[in-house]
Amino acid sequence: MLGVQKKCSTRKTAARKTVVRKPAAKKTAAKKAPVRKVAAKKTVARKTVAKKTVAARKPVAKKATAKKAPVRKVAAKKTVARKTVAKKTVAARKPVAKKATAKKAPVRKAVAKKTVARKTVAKKTVAARKPVAKRVASTKKSSIAVKAGVCMKKHKHTAACGRVAASGVKVCASAAKRKTNPNRSRTAHSWRQQLMKLVAR
């Protein structure tokens, strides 16, 4: 076989005797040709069948049957005498005279008007308002702040207004001032800061 290496003969294999095989002598058997037997044919005598003469059929004479036309009986018409019905003369209806009913005009009752005497209300003389003298805000805010008990900002005094100035006036902290400023625009950052303060409390 290709690709298979031959084994190197070892000492054991070399010691063995190599047996030489003799080819067996083939016997040539003489083939006998098969002998075919010819079958003897039997001659069968055929009988001739006598043909029967069939008598010719005579055509049957057709009877001409006279067809009778169906006779229609004419029904005798009965003459019915019509009676003339006397017409009834309907009396002409007289038009019914309509009664002219005099329509009564609804009489309206005139309600007597009550004359209500109006009382003349005496006009109250309103005293002329005197112009209120404007209070001149003094430069010293300390006296007003101490009297009012409210800090100088436009809101109620809270704990945030704890810082007291040297003059004795309570001044709001920056947080309290910014909350009330109308011009202040709120941003997302300020909202977040305020929420954080509320949560911390």
From Swiss-Prot:
Pfam families named in the record: HC2
Residue ranges of the region described as Disordered: 1-69
Keyword ATP-binding among record annotations: no
GO molecular function, one term: DNA binding
GO biological process: chromosome condensation
Family named by the database record: Belongs to the histone H1/H5 family. HCT subfamily.
Described function: Might have a role in establishing the nucleoid structure of elementary bodies.
NCBIfam families per the UniProt record, alphabetical: histone_lik_HC2
Protein name: Histone-like protein HC2
